[in-house]
From Swiss-Prot:
Entry's Gene Ontology molecular function annotations: ATP binding; magnesium ion binding; pyridoxal kinase activity
Documented EC number(s): 2.7.1.35
One Gene Ontology cellular component annotation held by this UniProt entry: cytosol
GO BP annotation list: pyridoxal 5'-phosphate salvage
Names of the cofactor(s): Mg(2+)
Organism: Pseudomonas aeruginosa (strain ATCC 15692 / DSM 22644 / CIP 104116 / JCM 14847 / LMG 12228 / 1C / PRS 101 / PAO1)
Name of the gene this protein is made from: pdxY
Top class in the EC scheme: transferase
Pfam families named in the record: Phos_pyr_kin
Subunit architecture: Homodimer.
Domain of life: Bacteria
Keyword Cell division belongs to the record: no
Organism placement in taxonomy: Bacteria, Pseudomonadati, Pseudomonadota, Gammaproteobacteria, Pseudomonadales
Protein name per the record: Pyridoxal kinase PdxY
Family membership: Belongs to the pyridoxine kinase family. PdxY subfamily.
Keywords annotated in UniProt: ATP-binding, Kinase, Magnesium, Nucleotide-binding, Transferase
Length: 288
């Protein structure tokens, strides 16, 4: 029987609803991953509600929790680290120390950085020190980097004029160290208004994926967290880059279809769980 992969997921958590680990952990488990959730913040709900309660995890707790895992002899079983929303730059540096420690224990372990800064329609939502950390430090360590358009623009200090520009910008990030760049949400002049587009770029390949853009009264939160988690999970389960990319696009679309059908603001992960594991739709990525 194949071994079940283990993944350390270090990002935000909400008690109510789905964002950060609350959006990613269950779907990753549902498709066959043992997830170790480590929450950088614990809030009552996501911040787009306009009010919330909760607190940021002190940075020193991150290595302390990993010490506990090492103490029971399990650290070498970690196959990947996923990082997302950070409450502070100090948290980010603690995560990079953890990544180095895990890679020492398991040299094959992967690190996917979801450089959460904000959203093209909402602007930057993190402190400048967090943005600086992601731009200047995290990208050099990540095996996979998963920005949205705002974050890609921030990394490259420019905005695209076309899809070709987006490819060029993503490819320029490979020089910093990542094996591949997954742009989870493209937005560029000339883009069709009725499609949602994603981009995957590696040294020897570039793939473009389009799916229908679904309308919501309020855009659900956590879609990017879901996408990053599914993409890394499928890589751990043996998919190549293209297949992991196509699976991610299909599974996320299935969740959004269920969410739209229910008239929900929060992602309908539980109702869509079988469609996450076995998407009924598939969108073919086009090689560029």
């Amino acid at each position: 029987m194949p071994r079940t992969p283990h993944l350390l997921a270090i990002q935000s958590h909400v008690v109510f609803g789905h964002a950060g680990n609350a959006a990613a952990v269950f779907p990753m488990q549902r498709i066959g991953i043992n997830v170790w959730p480590l929450n950088t913040v614990q809030f009552s709900n996501h911040t787009q509600y306009g009010r919330w309660t909760g607190q940021v995890l002190p940075p020193e707790q991150i290595p302390a929790l990993v010490d506990g895992i090492a103490g029971i002899g399990e650290l070498g079983n970690c196959d990947a680290v996923l990082s997302g929303y950070l409450g502070s730059a100090a948290q980010g540096r603690a995560i990079l120390d953890v990544v180095a420690r895990i890679k020492q224990a398991n040299p094959r372990a992967l690190y996917l950085c979801d450089p959460v800064m904000g959203h093209p329609e909402k602007g930057c939502i993190v402190a400048p020190e967090v943005s600086d950390f992601l731009l200047e430090e995290a990208a050099a360590v990540a095996d996979y980097l998963c920005p949205n358009q705002l974050e890609l623009d921030s990394f490259c200090d420019r905005q695209p004029n076309s899809l070709a520009d987006c490819v060029e910008m993503a490819r320029s990030l490979l020089a910093r160290g990542p094996r591949a760049i997954l742009v989870k949400h493209l937005n560029y002049p000339g883009k069709a208004g009725d499609t949602f587009e994603m981009l995957l770029v590696a040294a020897d390949q570039a793939w473009h994926l389009q799916r229908p853009l679904l309308a919501f009264p309020r855009q659900p939160v956590g879609v990017g967290d879901l996408a990053s988690g599914l993409f890394l999970s499928r890589l751990l389960l043996g998919d190549d880059l293209r297949n992991a990319f196509e699976f991610t696009g299909a599974a996320v679309h299935e969740v959004l279809l269920e969410t739209q059908a229910c008239g929900s603001y929060e992602l309908e992960l539980v109702r869509a769980q079988d469609r996450i594991a076995h998407p009924r739709v598939r969108f073919d990525a086009v090689r560029l």
